[in-house]
């Protein structure tokens, strides 16, 4: 019968977790710019908040406040409906 060596976690080299993940402070671009309402016709701004695969980037990644994230969602959906912004990444403009 084979005997197994017990794995000792203490002998593993320690990693510096802060150097692996550099987190910069997120801020809301719309708050800084003083935007009151996000317009669906501003396609350049909307494209910054759409991922490579065509999905809307969540607020926890962009740092957008909840009020502006809701406006951003409706603006992107309106722009998609009017064919200003593609639904997915396969439709290139």
From Swiss-Prot:
Tree of life domain: Bacteria
Gene Ontology CC: one annotated term: cytosolic small ribosomal subunit
One of the GO BP terms on file: translation
GO molecular function, one term: structural constituent of ribosome
SUPFAM superfamilies hit by this protein: Ribosomal protein S18
UniProt xrefs under InterPro entries: Ribosomal_bS18 (IPR001648), Ribosomal_bS18_CS (IPR018275), Ribosomal_bS18_sf (IPR036870)
Keywords per UniProt: Ribonucleoprotein, Ribosomal protein, RNA-binding, rRNA-binding
Entry similarity comment: Belongs to the bacterial ribosomal protein bS18 family.
UniProt subunit comment: Part of the 30S ribosomal subunit. Forms a tight heterodimer with protein bS6.
Function text: Binds as a heterodimer with protein bS6 to the central domain of the 16S rRNA, where it helps stabilize the platform of the 30S subunit.
Protein name: Small ribosomal subunit protein bS18
Lineage: Bacteria, Pseudomonadati, Pseudomonadota, Betaproteobacteria, Burkholderiales
Gene name, Swiss-Prot/TrEMBL: rpsR
